[in-house]
Amino acid sequence: MAGHSHSANIAHRKNAQDAARGKIFQKLSKEIFVAAQKGFDPEMNSALKLAISKAKAKNMPKDNIERAISKAKGDKNSNSFTETIFNATLSGGVSFIVTTLSDNLNRTRSNMTALFNKQNASLGKTGQIPFVFDHKGIIEFSKGELSEDDLMMVALENGAQEIETTDETFVLISNPEDFSQLKKALEDSFKIEEFLQCEILYLPNTYAEVSEEKQQKLLEFIDKLKDDDDVQDVYHNLDI
């Protein structure tokens, strides 16, 4: 990942989210609902705590979060949704990971197959992660008055592997197992209460460059994937 800033890809993700905020909140609510079925206390349920942090970073209203948890409390069917990871590689080396939460896996698989077939791509083995992706935690927050030197000392001691800077923010990357410790250290040491991004995701370690025309078509394809109600997140290694 050295030499390539994740900021451009992060910015694209945010722009897409802003354009479809209602859809994003719907997907986040589902994620919170599924996580909450395993326990309603985020301090005792790491999956719920992560889902709430992710939702807050995307400006999901507190009422929406509480409503999703309340819905889980009243739902006795804890196996209503299945989490699945799909992957595919298109011509030119553009790879995709699509995570889904579905109450009908056959429908979801059929939809994913149809979408990727239109791109002349076949789905890889379900659950398999292409080698061009790394599973990472990512935390982004406003710089405020915090110096990079002070941040670096705390971050590196608590699992940060990379520290990137933009004009107004810091972006920290860690292994998933260090994510919670790093987030807590930032909150405790610097009294950070709001994060612009706070989640565990798949980051590309190799990027694929395509023509401007093909890039535009692929971005439209990414939007189609995100429009599917069963799709939670779409990750790719397209160099934007």
From Swiss-Prot:
Keywords: Cytoplasm, DNA-binding, Transcription, Transcription regulation. It is found in: Cytoplasm. One of its GO terms (cellular component) is cytosol. The keyword DNA-binding applies. This is Probable transcriptional regulatory protein MS53_0373. NCBIfam families: PRK00110.1, PRK12378.1, YebC/PmpR family DNA-binding transcriptional regulator. The keyword Transcription applies. InterPro entries: Integrase-like_N, TACO1_YebC-like_2nd/3rd_dom, TACO1_YebC_N, Transcrip_reg_TACO1-like, Transcrip_reg_TACO1-like_dom3, YebC-like. Belongs to the TACO1 family. GO terms for biological process: regulation of DNA-templated transcription.
